[in-house]
């Protein structure tokens, strides 16, 4: 076998007939497969052992030679080589065709490659290939032209007239002869000369032809190889035939297709030997052509060949295509051994880095390790014995299993794997039962719940894999989400509830006002029943000397509750005492108001600030903030411990609290009946006005909807004001543990208006709430919206998944390749603000974790706040914003100069670790996942603006994100200015239903016509710049790039993506959108090739374009000129330099056809192409800089160094010598 890790690149090309013969181990002459009686392969058939190798390991067909010792011998009786049966997966055969046939990929593709080379239309080609017309190959001295088509009648006529003075043929043979005649160099030179004069369609076709001819010339492929003289037969184990019970056979479709080819080929040979009439031979040749077409790509031309049940047969092309094809099914996603799957269950007693594995599952997964250990300990005498012990599940294997799984992490994965946190490593702990056990805080990252979800478990085997799992993938390290750098392990449900209850305060509880010297004294008092968790007490600050209490408070007494005292025991000793849930208290000592002044009575203090404590129990959001703050200060290890302690505390507190809910806890609303009666009165009034013709039907509908919406809001308002610290439902909602005000309104108030399946609202509201119960009609109306919700979610999941797939595909080769690309460019970061939506993203958010590109000075004083080339952290970013700086020059991915990746300085901080990104980080994949993963949270809606702005629809949510990344023409497109200047006048032309906006530029004046109903976004006298909107709507990036530059377009796409996500409450970091936007603008379109050998109109990589130009400039020639070219992500993924990656994405046959003609070379720089060939990916620890590290050798002591022992021995030897003398 080839060692994949050794080779650098992979090339594809056309196979010549001789190449196909050289691959082959023999010719397949008969259509037979297996003898149905003996079940042995037939001689010369499709499964022949002489050609493809033995079916049994090291045994020839007749049984004369059996065993490894005969390896390599060819049996003299049956002619089969003695070797492993595995060769049947790699040895190929061939079929010698009696007549040449064309390869359907090159004849049928768009554009037809054969047609371009010969300059013949695909329609004419088809007539020739399928024997409907003759084509003139050599006109001789007749009046005919080369490549002229003749019908049967015309051919006879010309033959009668000219005899043998011309040559015309039909079928693939004619095409082969014509292709042999093509002189590539001559054609290319002629076409280049023609291009100077051609225009329009002819020019486009000429460029296409030139492109193909050039490809043939440069790749060394010969055009006539597009016509096949021999057909390769793929190895039999890739098209197996198996016997089913009942004696029938199941076979791969390919065998049927090969049988048709062989049958027709043999028949044609026979007819040729018999010198049959030309017509019969032609008919057979056509049938052979069709058989080979069906084998290569069934259904591409004409009706597909069908098998039993009218099912089209799967041809070789279908074996590669689509989700079930070779690329996606077997090369990019393989099934692996040492894995299992089971239902998951919660296990609150686990540590954050642990998971529970059921004993029988662990035993099966770690079986080889247990066997080895049993033998090593002498419990089993040999491996066979050990295996028997495991199968019997003897008692002495469990201790060994416990020992074996120590220090061996396992990976847990939950489908759908939306981002990298969907696969994490845990240390296994053996548990009873059959379910995998998961830590409750890991659920958020997996989006897992315990209603029947299943997860898969995998065992890393090699030492390297174990080390990587432990150091890079352990769940305890994954505290921040790569999407935006905020903690992903926020506590939820019971944990939140418990800690909220724990930190509540009540005036007048038992033991109020007691003062304790130490926290331990308070605990004793609690255990004795003297105080409660909610009691307000005093504690001496001196008992916690490591904490920062602020100036002068080190020996004071502070007022807190016993619950908060307990809660603070979770924090590190030197962290502030958190007494109120504010950002200030997280970052600095507790406020002065909580300390007793000298001589002040504690009861007076409680009267003064008691209500402040009562009003501020710790809610869910604040618990998340504490995690962030602890992470910033103490990093992973300590945060992980804090999370486990927080979990333990939450669960135990919610148990002690005894919070339950019942019907009685749902409060009564006082004003609902009156509000509903008033609303009904108003609705009657509206209906009356409609009947009298004072309102249109639409106005009536809108008014009724408004009346009921206001009514529901009023009821909701009353419920929102109901805040009772004793009411369990209220506590759940306010703590953030479960439920929101809307759920509460539906329980206690009214459900309000329901949506119809089309998204309109029913005019009849649901007045009942769930406590009262719904009427039949109300229930029926509610079902529409509920079902729509379900279907929308299902559709959105599919849409979002496909978007993620395209994003990953386009960005997968973006890796951090170097430390600094040395660019002096960057972008100007300022707050992103939208006219309608307000602030989208603040300047602070855009600065954190980025490098500065210029020195930043205070706008007032001029002093330096931050110098150039500094990584801005939270403090620095806040300092810059506080100084009133409006825009900052930062290093950006958009302006990075690294080819095939990004440098560390342009990327900045890795959000998942809050440290500077490391070389080898696969930032492209992370970016794609970060954009795709929240896709399901975006809406699918297209909003109808109801007749404003030319009644266009403004696309939002997921469709808008797709529109941006695919660079499609947006819905509701805005007209933009092409010049810098002033708006001269805005005129309405009622007759033609248009408005005209005149923009006066410095050089010329432009007039733009806009729809009559559109509201201009500018006014007369406004100063505007290129690319500014003249009417509201979305700008088409393809237009924007023409009138402005690449960077402006990139910044526009970035701002729009941010708008789509942040308005839906998803905080996405800029850098992820930047990575993808950069991928869309990696290409340029050549306008004028200058003196380079590039074709006009060619689309190529910017880096390649610069290299070609550099060579020409050095030699003193005229360089080529090009313009920036924007590609949607699907197009960009197909245009990648790697044909393997493109072929495995979409349009497999087209990509491979093109790549083989061009003799493309895949440099294997991305991740997908390396996964496909089974090479370690060039990211992370697979980067050359890590792979090429040589382990340090043991230090050898030079000869001149002696130890004392050596010297003593030497002296001894010398003494002996002298004695012997």
Swiss-Prot record:
Gene Ontology molecular function: any one: magnesium ion binding
Listed Pfam families: RNA_pol_Rpb1_1, RNA_pol_Rpb1_2, RNA_pol_Rpb1_3, RNA_pol_Rpb1_4, RNA_pol_Rpb1_5
Binding site for Zn(2+) 2: 821, 896, 903, 906
Gene Ontology terms: biological process: DNA-templated transcription
GO cellular component: DNA-directed RNA polymerase complex
Cofactor annotation remark: Binds 1 Mg(2+) ion per subunit. Binds 2 Zn(2+) ions per subunit.
Family: Belongs to the RNA polymerase beta' chain family.
NCBIfam families assigned to the protein according to its UniProt record, in alphabetical order: rpoC_TIGR (TIGR02386)
Protein name: DNA-directed RNA polymerase subunit beta'
Subunit annotation: The RNAP catalytic core consists of 2 alpha, 1 beta, 1 beta' and 1 omega subunit. When a sigma factor is associated with the core the holoenzyme is formed, which can initiate transcription.
Keywords: DNA-directed RNA polymerase, Magnesium, Metal-binding, Nucleotidyltransferase, Transcription, Transferase, Zinc
Catalytic reaction list: RNA(n) + a ribonucleoside 5'-triphosphate = RNA(n+1) + diphosphate
Cofactor dependence: Mg(2+); Zn(2+)
Known role: DNA-dependent RNA polymerase catalyzes the transcription of DNA into RNA using the four ribonucleoside triphosphates as substrates.
Ranges annotated as spanning the membrane: none
Gene that specifies this protein: rpoC
Species this protein is from: Lactobacillus delbrueckii subsp. bulgaricus (strain ATCC 11842 / DSM 20081 / BCRC 10696 / JCM 1002 / NBRC 13953 / NCIMB 11778 / NCTC 12712 / WDCM 00102 / Lb 14)
Top-rank EC class of the record's enzyme: transferase
E.C. code: 2.7.7.6
């Amino acid at each position: 076998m080839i060692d994949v890790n050794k080779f650098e690149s992979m090339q594809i090309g056309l196979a010549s007939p001789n190449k196909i013969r050289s691959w082959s181990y023999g010719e397949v002459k008969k259509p037979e497969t297996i003898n149905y009686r003996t079940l042995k392969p037939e001689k010369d058939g499709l499964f022949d052992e002489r050609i493809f190798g033995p079916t049994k390991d090291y045994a020839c067909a007749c049984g004369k030679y059996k065993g490894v010792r005969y390896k390599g011998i060819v049996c003299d009786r049956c002619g089969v080589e003695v070797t492993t049966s595995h060769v049947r997966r790699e040895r190929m055969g061939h079929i010698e065709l009696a007549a040449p046939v064309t390869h359907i990929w090159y004849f049928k593709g768009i554009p037809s490659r054969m047609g371009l080379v010969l300059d013949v239309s695909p329609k004419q080609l088809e007539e020739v290939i399928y024997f409907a017309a003759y084509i003139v190959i050599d006109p001789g001295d007749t009046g005919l032209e080369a490549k002229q088509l003749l019908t049967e009648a015309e051919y006879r006529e010309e033959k009668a007239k000219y005899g043998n003075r011309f040559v015309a043929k039909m079928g693939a043979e004619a095409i082969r002869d014509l292709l042999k005649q093509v002189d590539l160099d001559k054609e290319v030179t002629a076409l280049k000369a023609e291009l100077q004069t051609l225009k329009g369609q002819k020019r486009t076709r000429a460029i296409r032809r030139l492109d193909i001819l050039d490809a043939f010339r440069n790749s060394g492929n010969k055009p006539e190889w597009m016509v096949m003289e021999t057909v390769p037969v793929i190895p039999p184990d890739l098209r197996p035939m198996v016997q089913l019970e009942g004696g029938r056979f199941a076979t791969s479709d390919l065998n049927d297709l090969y049988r048709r080819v062989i049958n027709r080929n043999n028949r044609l040979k026979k007819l040729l030997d018999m010198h049959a009439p030309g017509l019969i031979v032609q008919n057979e040749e056509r049938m052979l052509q069709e058989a080979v077409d069906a084998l290569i790509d069934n259904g591409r031309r004409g009706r597909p060949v069908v098998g039993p049940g009218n099912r089209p047969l799967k041809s070789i092309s279908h074996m590669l295509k689509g989700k079930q094809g070779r690329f996606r099914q077997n090369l990019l996603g393989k099934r692996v051994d040492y894995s299992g799957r089971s239902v998951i269950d919660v296990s609150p007693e686990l540590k954050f880095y642990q998971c529970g594995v059921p004993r029988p599952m662990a035993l099966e997964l770690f079986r080889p390790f247990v066997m080895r250990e049993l033998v090593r300990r002498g419990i089993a005498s040999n491996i066979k014995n050990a295996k028997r012990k495991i199968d019997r599940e003897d008692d002495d294997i469990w201790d060994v299993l416990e020992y074996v799984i120590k220090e061996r992490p396992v990976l847990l994965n939950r489908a759908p794997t939306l981002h990298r946190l969907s696969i994490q490593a845990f240390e296994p702990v053996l548990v009873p039962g059959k379910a995998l056990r998961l830590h409750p805080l890991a659920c958020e990252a997996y989006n897992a719940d315990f209603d029947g979800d299943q997860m898969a478990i995998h065992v890393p085997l090699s030492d390297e894999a174990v080390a990587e799992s432990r150091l890079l993938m352990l769940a305890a390290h994954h505290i921040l989400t790569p999407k935006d750098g905020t903690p992903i392990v926020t506590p939820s449900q019971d944990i939140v509830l418990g800690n909220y209850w724990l930190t509540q305060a009540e005036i007048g509880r038992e033991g109020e006002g007691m003062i304790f010297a130490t926290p331990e004294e308070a605990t004793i008092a609690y255990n004795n029943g003297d105080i409660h968790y909610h009691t307000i007490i005093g504690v001496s600050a001196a008992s916690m000397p490591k904490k920062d209490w602020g100036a002068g408070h080190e020996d004071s007494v502070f007022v807190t509750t016993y619950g908060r005292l307990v809660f603070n025991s979770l924090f590190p000793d030197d962290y502030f005492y958190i007494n109120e849930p504010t950002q200030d208290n997280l970052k600095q000592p507790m406020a002065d108001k909580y300390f007793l002044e000298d001589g002040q009575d504690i009861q007076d203090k409680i009267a003064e600030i008691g209500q402040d404590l009562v009003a501020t129990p710790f809610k869910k959001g604040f618990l998340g903030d504490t995690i962030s703050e602890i992470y910033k200060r103490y990093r992973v290890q300590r945060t992980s411990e804090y999370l486990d302690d927080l979990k333990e505390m939450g669960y135990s507190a919610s148990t002690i609290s005894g919070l339950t809910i019942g019907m009685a806890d749902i409060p009564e609303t006082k004003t609902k009946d009156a509000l509903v009666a008033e609303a009904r009165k108003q609705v009657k009034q509206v209906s009356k006005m409609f009947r009298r013709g004072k309102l249109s039907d639409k106005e009536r509908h809108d008014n009724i909807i408004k009346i009921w919406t206001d009514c529901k809001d009023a009821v909701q308002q009353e419920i929102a004001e109901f805040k009772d610290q004793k009411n369990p439902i209220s506590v759940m909602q306010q703590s953030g543990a479960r439920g929101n005000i809307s759920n509460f309104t539906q329980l206690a108030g009214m459900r309000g208006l329901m949506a119809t399946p089309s998204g309109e609202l029913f005019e009849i509201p649901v007045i009942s709430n769930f406590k009262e119960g719904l009427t039949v009609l109300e229930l029926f109306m509610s079902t529409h919206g509920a079902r729509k919700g379900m279907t929308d979610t299902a559709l959105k999941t599919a849409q979002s998944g496909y978007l993620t797939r395209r994003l990953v595909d386009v960005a997968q080769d973006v890796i951090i390749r170097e430390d600094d690309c040395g660019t002096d460019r960057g972008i100007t970061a300022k707050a992103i603000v939208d006219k309608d939506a307000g602030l989208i993203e603040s300047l602070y958010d855009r600065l954190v974790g980025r490098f500065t590109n210029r020195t930043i000075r205070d706008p007032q004083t001029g002093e330096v706040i931050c110098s150039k080339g500094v990584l801005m952290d939270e403090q620095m970013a806040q300092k810059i914003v506080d100084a009133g700086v409006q825009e900052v020059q930062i290093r950006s991915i958009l302006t990075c100069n690294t080819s095939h990746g990004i440098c560390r300085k342009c990327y900045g901080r890795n959000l998942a670790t809050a440290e500077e990104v490391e070389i080898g980080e696969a930032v492209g994949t992370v970016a794609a996942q970060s954009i795709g993963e929240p896709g399901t949270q975006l809406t699918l809606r297209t909003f109808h603006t109801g007749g404003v702005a030319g009644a266009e629809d403004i696309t939002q949510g997921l469709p808008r994100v797709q529109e941006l990344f695919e660079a499609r023409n947006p819905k509701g497109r805005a007209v933009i200015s092409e010049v810098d200047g002033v708006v001269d006048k805005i005129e309405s032309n009622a007759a033609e239903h248009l408005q005209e906006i005149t923009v006066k530029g410095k050089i010329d004046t432009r007039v733009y016509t806009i729809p009559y109903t559109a509201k201009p976004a500018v006014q007369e006298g406004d100063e505007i710049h290129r690319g500014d909107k003249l009417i509201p709507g979305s700008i088409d990036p393809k237009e924007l790039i023409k009138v402005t530059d690449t960077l402006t377009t990139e910044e526009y796409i970035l701002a729009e993506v941010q708008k789509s996500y942040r308005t839906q409450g998803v905080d996405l970091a800029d850098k992820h959108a930047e990575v993808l936007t950069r991928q869309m603008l990696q290409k340029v379109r050549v306008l004028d090739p200058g003196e380079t050998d590039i074709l006009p109109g060619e689309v190529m990589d910017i880096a390649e374009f610069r290299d070609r130009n550099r060579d020409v400039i050095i030699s003193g020639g005229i360089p080529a000129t090009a313009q920036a070219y924007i590609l949607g992500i699907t197009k960009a993924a197909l245009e990648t330099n790697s044909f393997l990656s493109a072929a495995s994405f979409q349009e497999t046959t087209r990509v491979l056809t093109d790549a083989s003609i061009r003799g493309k070379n895949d440099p294997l720089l991305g991740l997908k192409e390396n996964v496909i060939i089974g090479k370690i990916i060039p990211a992370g620890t697979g980067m050359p800089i890590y792979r090429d590290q040589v382990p340090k050798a043991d230090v050898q002591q030079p000869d001149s160094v002696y130890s004392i022992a050596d010297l003593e021995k030497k002296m001894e030897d010398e003494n002996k010598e002298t004695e012997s003398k």
